Amino acid sequence: MYKRQASGFKDERIIGIRMSTRPDYINKEILEQCVEFGVKTIELGVQSASNRVLELNRRGHVFEDVIRAAEMIKSFGIELGLQMMLGMYGSDPETDIETCRKIIELEPKCTRIYPTLVLSGTALESLYIRGEYIPYTLETAVSTAKRCLLMFRKAGVEVIRIGLYPGEDLRSEGNIVAGPFHSAFGELVENAVYKDKIEEEIIQKRLRDCDYEIIAPSSETSKIIGQKKCNKEYFFKKYGVRIKVKNRLG
């Protein structure tokens, strides 16, 4: 059925077919079919580069499977996407940063960064109830995601999503038991990036009790000011600096 659907997409000149799968599902025959039916991008759920973390979370694959699958995908001329999860059972911020480094070494076209949430009815919920798993706080998740985002950008890897899509299934009552969920998680990460940049400028220029104008596209204004103007308030309270954003086209 999926082959027929993909073939129909190709016939209609839809050229952007994107697929997501496990790294241990990739083989030569599957990739040949993907090429035949016009698949442009394959994303792999890496989750972690630590085999210990993968085993603890019963992922059913090791990081060597990711390396093998990534190289095969690229050898077929298909764009590679890699997805990582922050704060998995058995992980910590430095382990997550190492996962980011190893993902960069595989030279993907794009990546996604997801925080781990404790969902109702899962094995992770049982670990959480027993006190064996402590999820990241929102602050830790944002801080770690920020570090990964900056590393990916420096390496030229496009980050196409930060945070889980807040759909109805995820947000249904009682579904999220614990963890760093925020409907605008990606925006919080971008806020943190701008906060660091602006604070560095304020310190370097020794700004105090003054207006500080930032020229930026209108699309960046909310990221600079922060959720509920948190960045703006932070700089005024700490330095007496009043952030003002002047929009330019772009």
Segments predicted by a language model, with ranges:
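Short, charged low-complexity intrinsically disordered segments located at boundaries
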Residues: 1, 30-38, 49, 177-182, ...
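Conserved non-cysteine loop/helix-boundary elements of the Radical SAM core domain that shape
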Residues: 3-116, 120-140
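Auxiliary Fe-S-binding modules of radical SAM enzymes
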Residues: 123, 130-250
